[in-house]
Amino acid sequence: MMPFYFGIDPTYILVIIGIAISGAASAYVNSTFRKYDQVRSSKHVTGTQAAQYILQKEQINDVGVQQIAGDLTDNYNSGNKMLSLSEATAQSTSVAAIGVAAHECGHAVQDHTNYVPLRLRAAIVPVANIGSTISFPLILIGVLFSWNQTLINIGILAFSLALIFQLVTLPVEFNASRRALSILSCLLYTSPSPRD
């Protein structure tokens, strides 16, 4: 355990920094999506239509496309070969919606080509989900019960596992985005025209 300085354990500072970075990244993604959600695609296709076209063009015939509830809850599930698009993405003709749909198609292409980092990410998802779910409750309970260091340490370890998952995920996400940009530039879906 690290020593206390001025009554503060440096580990807590690292956790706070991690939370701040996570919050800032989430805010950036949301603001960028909102900005480009106001720009319509020149092709006037929805996110769902774009995804179906991309999958067909990439000759991926075993992946379904469905609409799900939520906002920016879009995901690709390699286990059931399902590309799920949130309501905001599925029905919108904005370049943001088409970009998100293409990004998720990038994950389907990764799966189709057996991209190793995607396989690694899929293998550690269960552990990371547990870590992100229990980390803050354990830290909070540890603090509430007279600074129970064992619970706090387990919470920090769980948070660390979730952070490691995010680090492993970055190359997968960047690769999916690169694939999406390549696909979109070939399909000419990104010629924007401002909405009225």
Which positions does each model-derived feature cover?
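Short, strongly hydrophobic alpha-helical membrane anchors
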Residues: 1-8
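Membrane-cytosol interface motif
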Residues: 39-56, 181-189
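Residue-level signature of catalytic and energy-coupling elements of molecular machines
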Residues: 51, 103, 176
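Catalytic zinc-binding patch centered on the HExxH motif and its immediate surroundings
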Residues: 68-82
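Short pre-active-site segment immediately N-terminal to the catalytic Zn-binding motif
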Residues: 87-98
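Active-site recognition of the HExxH zinc-binding catalytic motif
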Residues: 99-111
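Metalloprotease/metallohydrolase-associated module, dominated by Zn2+-dependent proteases
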Residues: 127-187
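Conserved small/polar residues in nucleotide/adenosyl-binding loops
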Residues: 189-196
